């Protein structure tokens, strides 16, 4: 095998390995980003629920006092 064909084969092999690594990183990063967005939405909803519950409890306590 000549040196040129050896270099071509090794470059092709390294290129495919690199592409697979990059694809897996991008895919994992995308899923991580989506999960973090979902978590932030859930946290925001929990905070809203807590505030609504506090407001509702205050409203009930005011009615009980009357």
UniProtKB/Swiss-Prot annotation:
It comes from Bacillus subtilis (strain 168). This is SPbeta prophage-derived uncharacterized protein YopM. The gene is yopM.
């Amino acid at each position: 095998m000549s040196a040129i064909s050896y270099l071509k084969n090794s470059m092709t092999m390294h290129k495919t390995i690199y592409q697979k690594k990059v694809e897996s990183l991008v895919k994992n990063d995308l899923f991580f980003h989506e999960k973090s967005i979902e978590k932030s939405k859930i946290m925001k909803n929990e905070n809203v629920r807590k505030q609504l519950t506090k407001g509702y409890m205050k409203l009930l306590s005011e009615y009980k006092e009357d």
